[in-house]
Swiss-Prot record:
Name of the protein in its database record: Leukotoxin translocation ATP-binding protein LktB
Gene: lktB
Its EC number(s): 7.4.2.5
Catalytic activity: ATP + H2O + proteinSide 1 = ADP + phosphate + proteinSide 2
Annotated source species: Mannheimia haemolytica
Gene3D superfamilies, alphabetized: ABC transporter type 1, transmembrane domain, Cysteine proteinases, P-loop containing nucleotide triphosphate hydrolases
Domain ABC transporter span(s) in chain numbering: 469-704
Effect of residue 46 to A: In strain: Serotype A2 / PH278 and Serotype A2 / PH494
Alphabetical UniProt keywords: ATP-binding, Cell inner membrane, Cell membrane, Membrane, Nucleotide-binding, Translocase, Transmembrane, Transmembrane helix, Transport
SUPFAM superfamilies: ABC transporter transmembrane region, P-loop containing nucleoside triphosphate hydrolases
Principal location listed in the UniProt entry: membrane
Length: 708
């Protein structure tokens, strides 16, 4: 009976953790009620059905240990004895396995022997159906197919123009043949004049059509470029906060900049060269008519180009990958250095930073040079094949002319036609580095575009928030193998109540507000506003109705008015001024020469720290949110500015639910209730004077420290 109960607990815990990993919230009691019908725990079948009910795609497989590195992780290792555990990562180099022990609620690293002892060969692979749809519509070269279909009329016109260009290219060698074999032999000046005029007309049409094709093609690809750029930025802003917290800013910027490579590829000569190559069969037919032997030489050279490209491509791709990695490191270091310029100058560490930059730059230049050398070798190999074919054709063609099987005019025409065939091949071979580069760019950009955006079940968009907040049995960690940040937190906040949250650093205060903003979904439990589960809510609907002021706020390089009215640019000036007065910002803004039209500079560099903070507070208040979060919002203010805000606090809090997070207890002492947190748990709560009566409590201890 105990084993069954244990299996029930571990199966449910595993399902909860995997659902959280895929940004899906669940109620364990509801799952137990629906699928644990006999009270003996979730069986394999009921576990799979429960996962399906949560919009998870779960599949039970049997896998040998030697092939575990090929599966998508994390996965559930299913045990017949009920002692299931999560497989998080396989380290093939060191034969180690990162697992999560559900019984001990802690990550474990197992050796090969230890893992073999507990692994029974059964896995449950879990993916969200949203991610499955994302994989089917993932960003790669196939993404451009719908775009091509969308502009199929324009591309069809380009195709028709290309056909005419190939016909004109076919006519020119024929004219030269007539001149060599007929006009020169018979001294036909009238025929020469006619052919010259006709050739001039053909050349004019060819130039016009070629320019028209380039214009239409570039116009179409520019539209695709705009669509891709717009899609990229929208997707980037829709990604969850965890995406940005787990990546360096420079890495993300480097990936976004790969759009330039794709843009250059789309608007360059590569695609028109592909079109020219597709019509080569027309030339082959005419060339075969002239001389099958010479045509076979040309055809025989094509596999040489292909084989040479196949040989060079893998090496080139590896070197391009390395070049991108070095470039991303440089980009990240540059962004980090510029962002931290005040610290660098204050600590006089510019020489150390310069030394690091020089080393990274040298590494990038070396990597770039290796790419250039290999690309040059590739191009010279193509030139070698081309020159060899030219020599063979010259020798064989001369033999055919001498033997009378081919006229001089036909030989010249044949060489011109072969040039039309080989030219796009050579261009493509020379552009092969661009093909490889754009392939890597698509992959790197796919890292952004294929990352799942913030998902929510049911698109729950409700009317205006009233402000009743409930945290029920909240358990949360940022990663499956990370320590628990919040553990069994239960908290009810009444509508219009002012709550102060205090505690040591790392106690989980800010994490609680991140869950309230739905930046994350709890591993266990529910966060509710007005009785509605935020796991099912539209994040944009929620965040529009919550005002947040952090310790370090970012202002955009716009005017003060635009920064305050960021969410509604058409907002009446009266509302902007009222919010600024509440935040204690109106007086210093009025003293500025441009007033509310003053440009604040990048990240508010033109203002002091206290001024930036007051504008951020005004920005949070201007929409009259029903829930207001101050996360160390006044810690960066001078005492005068803080005094102004605290004087206005009664007006600020009126009609709102307010959460004040602070280290300075003076900020929260007038709150309706103070919550004291320690190691992810609520250890005390009450009013200021009530908490001080407990001399052994954490609040009293912190208060005494600040008094001293």
């Amino acid at each position: 009976m105990e084993a069954n109960h244990q299996r029930n607990d571990l199966g449910l815990v595993a399902l909860t953790m995997l659902a959280q990993y895929h940004n899906i919230s669940l109620n364990p009691e509801e799952i137990k009620h629906k699928f644990d019908l006999d009270g003996k725990g979730l069986s394999l079948t009921s576990w799979l059905l429960a996962a399906k009910s949560l919009a998870l795609k779960a599949k039970h497989i049997k896998k040998e240990i030697s092939r575990l590195h090929l599966v998508n992780l994390p996965a559930l290792v299913w045990q017949d004895n009920g002692k299931h555990f999560l497989l998080v990562k396989v380290d093939t180099d060191n034969n180690r396995y990162l697992t999560y022990n559900l019984e001990q609620d802690a990550p474990q690293i197992l050796s090969q022997d230890e893992f073999e002892a507990c692994y029974q060969g059964q896995l449950i692979l879990v993916t969200s159906r949203a991610s499955v749809v994302g994989q089917l519509a993932k960003f790669d070269f196939t993404w451009f197919i719908p775009a091509v279909i969308k502009y199929r009329k324009i591309f069809l016109e380009t195709l028709i123009v290309s056909i005419f260009l190939q016909i004109f290219a076919l006519i020119t060698p024929l004219f030269f043949q007539v001149v060599m074999d007929k006009v020169l032999v018979h001294r036909g000046f009238s025929t020469l004049n006619i052919i010259t005029v006709a050739l001039a007309i053909v050349i004019i049409f060819e130039i016009v059509l070629s320019g028209l094709r380039t214009y239409v093609f570039s116009h179409s690809t520019s539209r695709i470029d705009v669509e891709l750029g717009a899609k990229l930025f929208r997707h980037l802003l829709s990604l969850p906060i965890s995406y940005f917290e787990n990546r360096r800013v420079g890495d993300t910027v480097a990936r976004v900049r790969e759009l330039d490579q794709i843009r250059n590829f789309l608007t360059g000569q590569a695609l028109t060269s592909v079109l020219d190559l597709l019509f080569s069969f027309i030339f082959f037919a005419v060339m075969w008519y002239y001389s099958p032997k010479l045509t076979l030489v040309i055809l025989g050279s094509l596999p040489c180009y292909i084989l040479w490209s196949i040989f060079i491509s893998p090496i080139l791709r590896r070197r391009l990958d390395d070049k991108f990695a070095r470039s991303a490191d440089n980009q990240a270091f540059l962004v980090e250095s510029v962002t931290a310029i005040n610290m660098i100058k204050a600590m006089a560490v510019a020489p150390q930073m310069t030394d690091t930059w020089d080393k990274q730059l040298a590494s990038y230049v070396s990597s770039s040079f290796r790419v250039t050398v290999l690309a040059t070798i590739g191009q010279q190999g193509v030139q070698l094949i081309q020159k060899t074919v030219m020599v063979i054709n010259l020798w064989l063609g001369a033999h055919l002319v001498i033997s009378g099987d081919l006229s001089i005019g036909q030989l010249i025409a044949f060489n011109m036609l072969s040039g039309q065939v080989i030219a796009p091949v050579i261009r493509l071979a020379q552009l092969w580095q661009d093909f490889q580069q754009v392939g890597i760019s698509v992959t790197r950009l796919g890292d952004v575009l294929n990352s799942p955006t913030e998902q929510y079940q049911g698109k729950l968009s409700l009317p205006e928030i009233k402000g009743y907040i409930s945290f029920k049995n909240i358990r949360f960690r940022y990663k499956p193998d990370a320590p628990t940040i919040l553990n069994n937190v239960n908290l009810e906040i009444r509508q219009g109540e002012v709550i102060g949250i205090v505690g040591r650093s790392g106690s989980g205060k800010s994490t609680l507000t991140k869950l309230l903003q739905r930046f994350y979904i709890p591993e266990n439990g529910q966060v509710l506003i007005d009785g509605h589960d935020l796991a099912l809510a539209d994040p944009n609907w929620l965040r529009r109705q919550i005002g947040v002021v952090l310790q370090d706020n970012v202002l955009l390089n716009r005017s003060i008015r635009e920064n305050i009215a960021l969410s509604d640019p058409g907002m009446p000036m009266e509302r902007v001024i009222y919010a600024a007065k509440l935040a204690g910002a109106h007086d210093f803004i009025s003293e500025l020469r441009e007033g509310y039209n003053t440009i604040v500079g990048e990240q508010g560099a033109g203002l002091s720290g206290g001024q930036r903070q007051r504008i951020a507070i005004a920005r949070a208040l201007v929409n009259n949110p029903k829930i207001l979060i101050f996360d160390e919002a006044t810690s960066a203010l001078d005492y005068e500015s803080e005094h102004i805000i605290m004087q206005n606090m009664q007006k600020i809090c009126q009609g709102r639910t307010v959460i004040l997070i602070a280290h300075r207890l003076s900020t929260v002492k007038n709150a309706d209730r103070i919550i004291v947190m320690e190691k992810g748990e609520i250890v005390e709560q009450g009013k200021h004077h009530e908490l001080l009566q407990n001399s052994n409590g954490l609040y009293s201890y912190l208060h005494q420290l600040q008094l001293n």
